[in-house]
Regions:
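Active-site-proximal loop/hinge segments that shape catalytic or ion-binding/gating pockets
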Residues: 576
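C-terminal helical cap/extension that packs against the catalytic core
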Residues: 264-270, 274, 379, 387, ...
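N-terminal leader/targeting and accessory segments in enzymes
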Residues: 1-105, 109-110, 115-121
Length: 593
């Protein structure tokens, strides 16, 4: 289908959804509207978030970084100037006893595991999730946590305006950049909060890359970590794993221990070279199985086989931090077999303590391999948005379905995919990876919670228009339909020589499809999509409204009947953490409190 025809379909869709005279101001993960003029600062939380949003959105910050790629080092110097204007010096950050973590996949989970382990030792923890890594699920204050809890709206508001006024008072009219962008402001604010709260340690997640990330003004972390590497943000970090590894290794510091998980040979060699250049002791984490040997198996609070590597890295980071701070009870060393094939020395193999075990078990990370059961509906939520993370998501979904109680062949079950992908990522490879899950329905919608006006500043987005997001959903549907056509001719189950980790190796056991076949639908917002999927069977969701908000599709009514009669409905929500956050907000309204 041509792009022009897609635009015409989007226009018809808008006409169907919004009657004449209705203003299409849309609520979403962030609201779609023209950027408002900054208002006089108030003292309410929503006022603070609106003003924060006016500084710049992530997308415009990334565009600025791309324009200035030849002058990257200047960005760190600029960040140091902002820090000084805020009333702090780089040396002040030393007292935060920082654990600095980068990586492409799993760095957020690694940080969550690490923070939970150390909190179990009675330590007061700070945790900062950089805006460059992933979007916040519901509220921006989730990014700054004390003892695992987001700072309260009152504390966020107080710290925001204090920092904002300091920066306003120190503006230089001759400078081309008078206020820090969204990324930088939140990073500065986190440092101020952690210092004022007198945390024992701060776990700081890198936003994008490492070498030139705004968090890399940290000069003396206690320990650094690098989670699994992959291809992402190529316009900023480079288009090869080696180039990306060079950027990630930029957080290494002289004499500061660093740990990484197994990586491909090329990127691992780059990390080793980066470490050697600045005399940073870099260690390779042994697998979790080595720490479990002779011990009860470790239970992880985050599901998915891929979380074991993140947990192994977190254990090493936590133990190293405790050791360097002269804490007792850090786990007895165990004998280990040295590997002659490693490019790096192996990190210690030790016996995890009860604090470590309970920390791993009790870790929670909403929106990542998360399962919610609501009567006959089970929601599988994972914000995977790269090929490698979607592969891991499919493995997790497959394992979860295999673990569920088996129902007889006469009991109908339905599988639904709810998907969206944003930015400049190509959705086709992601959708192809999801195909083997054998979904009965593929549902596409923008990252908009509902179609209505809102005053919720946490969900504002100034970077895209309604036409753009709906057109992208239609393109997702077209990709899915083409995959349907391809699957109709060759035998999907007899692909010779499946590539390790590729789609064929992720196939679920074949099952007979429902009589209605596979169908795809497009909705105008998350709320309408959830209403159609749940068909009134989830008491916390509204009864389905008229299907006029649907892009016209002949299976809308028959699909609703199938969903109402199914004994079990399994819904995988993936492709965008914004989408997952919007779904969670509707399924669990307490997250907005």
């Amino acid at each position: 289908m041509s792009r022009a025809r897609s635009h015409r379909r989007a226009g018809l869709f808008l006409a169907a959804v919004f009657p004449r005279g209705v203003t299409t101001r849309v609520t979403g993960r962030r609201e779609l509207s023209a950027r408002p003029a900054p208002q006089e600062p108030g003292m309410e939380y929503q006022d603070a978030v609106r003003t924060l949003n006016s500084l710049q959105t992530n997308a415009s910050y990334l565009a600025e970084v791309k324009r200035r790629r030849g002058d990257l080092q200047t960005q760190l110097e600029t960040m140091k100037l902002y820090l000084a204007r805020s009333g702090l010096q780089v040396e002040d950050l030393d007292q935060l006893n920082i654990i600095h973590v980068t990586g492409t996949k799993g760095k957020g989970s690694t940080c969550a595991f690490t923070e939970r382990i150390l909190r179990n030792y009675g330590l007061k923890t700070g945790f900062f999730r950089s805006p460059g890594s992933s979007p916040h699920l519901v509220q921006v204050r989730e990014r700054i946590r004390i003892n695992g809890q987001p700072i309260s709206p009152e504390h966020f508001t107080k710290h925001f305006w204090r920092l904002y006024h300091r920066l306003e008072e120190t503006k230089d009219s001759s400078s081309c950049v008078s206020m820090p962008a969204y990324f930088r402001f939140l990073t500065l604010m986190a440092f101020h909060v952690f210092l004022q709260e007198k945390v024992d340690l701060a776990v700081v997640e890198v936003g994008i890359g490492g070498a030139y990330d705004c968090t890399n003004i940290i000069r003396k972390p206690v320990v650094c970590g690098v989670s699994s590497l992959g291809i992402d943000h190529t316009s900023l970090l480079g288009d090869t794993m080696e180039k990306i590894a060079w950027q990630k290794g930029g957080i290494f510091k002289h004499g500061v221990p660093a740990f990484t998980v197994p990586q491909p040979d090329g990127p691992l060699a780059v990390l080793r070279e980066r470490a050697e250049q600045i005399s940073c002791p870099l260690y390779l984490c042994p697998p979790l199985e080595a720490l479990e040997e002779g011990e009860p198996p470790l239970t992880l609070g985050l599901e998915g086989e891929h979380q074991r590597a993140n947990a192994a890295l977190a254990l090493q980071l936590a133990r190293c931090w405790l050791q360097r701070k002269d804490h007792q009870g850090i786990g007895e060393l165990k004998a280990s077999r040295p590997s002659l094939l490693c490019q790096l020395p192996l990190a210690p193999v030790f016996q995890p303590t009860s604090h470590m075990r309970h920390g791993l078990r009790d870790t929670e990370w909403p929106g990542r391999t998360q399962t919610l059961r609501r009567g006959p509906l089970t929601w599988y939520l994972d914000g995977a948005h790269t090929s490698s993370s979607v592969q891991a998501c499919v493995r997790w979904f497959r394992q979860a379905l295999h673990r569920r109680p088996k129902s007889g062949p006469e009991v109908p079950e339905v599988r639904v995919l709810l998907f969206n992908s944003t930015g400049d990522r190509d959705p086709a490879p992601l959708l192809k990876l999801l195909r083997p899950c054998q979904f009965d329905y593929a549902v596409f919608c923008p990252n908009l919670t509902e179609v209505s006006s809102t005053d919720n500043a946490d969900q504002q987005n100034f970077m895209v228009t309604l036409d753009q997001v709906l057109l992208r959903c239609l393109e997702h549907q077209q990709h899915w339909s083409r995959l349907d056509e391809e699957a109709a001719s060759p035998d999907l189950w007899s692909t010779p020589g499946p590539e390790a980790g590729g789609p064929a190796s992720l196939l679920l056991a074949p099952r007979l499809p429902h009589a209605h076949g596979t169908s795809s639908l497009v909705f105008s917002c998350i709320s309408h999509a959830l209403q159609w999927i749940s068909q009134g069977r989830d008491p916390d969701l509204q009864t389905p409204s008229s299907p006029r908000d649907l892009l016209a599709h002949p299976v809308a009514s028959s699909g609703a009947s199938v969903l109402r009669e199914a004994a079990a409905v399994h819904v995988l929500v993936t492709g965008s953490l914004h989408l997952v956050g919007g779904v969670l907000k509707l399924l669990d309204p307490s997250l907005s409190q």
